[in-house]
Amino acid sequence: MEPPGPSTPTASAAARADHYTPGLRPLPKRRLLYSFALLLAVLQAVFVPVTANPAHNRPAGLQRPEESPSRGPCLAGQYLSEGNCKPCREGIDYTSHSNHSLDSCILCTVCKEDKVVETRCNITTNTVCRCKPGTFEDKDSPEICQSCSNCTDGEEELTSCTPRENRKCVSKTAWASWHKLGLWIGLLVPVVLLIGALLVWKTGAWRQWLLCIKRGCERDPESANSVHSSLLDRQTSSTTNDSNHNTEPGKTQKTGKKLLVPVNGNDSADDLKFIFEYCSDIVPFDSWNRLMRQLGLTDNQIQMVKAETLVTREALYQMLLKWRHQTGRSASINHLLDALEAVEERDAMEKIEDYAVKSGRFTYQNAAAQPETGPGGSQCV
């Protein structure tokens, strides 16, 4: 018996060879993981598209508008279908605002039996319903139309019943009182207006109002006459002074002020312009407007002169010229001095008065007959 060698199979090996069945080998672990990942990808591709857009299953009114990446929003009266905007059906459904992804329009409202159609539904507006005649819609319960109430025997109808408001009634006593009051007011108002018109006509105030409208009303109605009244008082005092020989010549009895007159006795237009040039250096800038209002110019005239004057320093001179042209020959240096005193610019008044006398163009009244020792009479320090 030969011993088994490397090339001679043993009996057990031969037996295993007889029972061996060819088939699949067991898969390695790595290939098993790859197969599992591929299976998950297939399942995701199958099920996710089915549930990705649940908005199509909701009613049109509850769908959220979603941005369409391919185009802008659909206009009112349209809805989005297959990427295109399509119109709603007239009288059936509508959309009142622009939308991005509504896949259907909103159905129009159908009016209930107790209401009638006020405005029919179109592609952009829903149906508007209102209550039938004899009924009204209460604000607290608008879904139901209620019957209009009737006024009792002791009441009068104040407002009639409308589809949106009930009838309002008021007692006959109160109604009679209001009716009488309305009649009295209707009678008295024309009478008062007529009496007022007659008073305005008889007093001549309408002429002043007409002049005020043409020239522009002043802020203070009394300021226009203040300078003239002051000058009239001074002239009256001067007349009394002439008849009183015991009073110092050239001074008034009441105030002690003196009137300035041109030396040559002629028209003082050039002399006034000479004084106007000096005023721009003496009168403070903040007092220019008040001074001109005191002299009688309106705010509109003041602003117009300022706008037309290029150099600020020339504005007062131009305003004084405007006043002189408007006043005419009655304008005098005494008006200017009175106005300066009225606006509390006494220092400027005294300097201008002293300058006018020293210039030789003006002198105090009656100074030629009885000259005073000092230059210009009395000078204030």
Swiss-Prot record:
Topological domains, Cytoplasmic: 202-381
Signal peptide bounds: 1-52
GO cellular component, as recorded: membrane
Subcellular location: Membrane
GO molecular function, one term: TRAIL binding
Pfam families assigned: Death (PF00531), TNFR_c6 (PF00020)
Gene3D superfamilies named in the record: Death Domain, Fas, Tumor Necrosis Factor Receptor, subunit A, domain 2
Location, primary (coarse class): membrane
InterPro entries, alphabetized: DEATH-like_dom_sf, Death_dom, TNFR/NGFR_Cys_rich_reg, TNFR_10, TNFRSF10, TNFRSF10_N, TNFRSF10A/B_death
Stretches assigned to the Death domain: 273-356
Coiled coil: none
Cysteine pairings via disulfide bonds: C74-C85, C88-C105, C108-C121, C111-C129, C131-C145, C148-C161, C151-C169
Compositional bias annotation for Low complexity: 236-247
Membrane topology: Single-pass type I membrane protein
Region (Disordered): 228-260
Keywords: Apoptosis, Disulfide bond, Glycoprotein, Membrane, Receptor, Repeat, Signal, Transmembrane, Transmembrane helix
Tissues with expression: Highly expressed in heart, lung and kidney.
PANTHER family: TUMOR NECROSIS FACTOR RECEPTOR SUPERFAMILY MEMBER 10B
Biological role: Receptor for the cytotoxic ligand TNFSF10/TRAIL. The adapter molecule FADD recruits caspase-8 to the activated receptor. The resulting death-inducing signaling complex (DISC) performs caspase-8 proteolytic activation which initiates the subsequent cascade of caspases (aspartate-specific cysteine proteases) mediating apoptosis. Promotes the activation of NF-kappa-B. Essential for ER stress-induced apoptosis.
Protein name: Tumor necrosis factor receptor superfamily member 10B
Lineage per the UniProt record: Eukaryota, Metazoa, Chordata, Craniata, Vertebrata
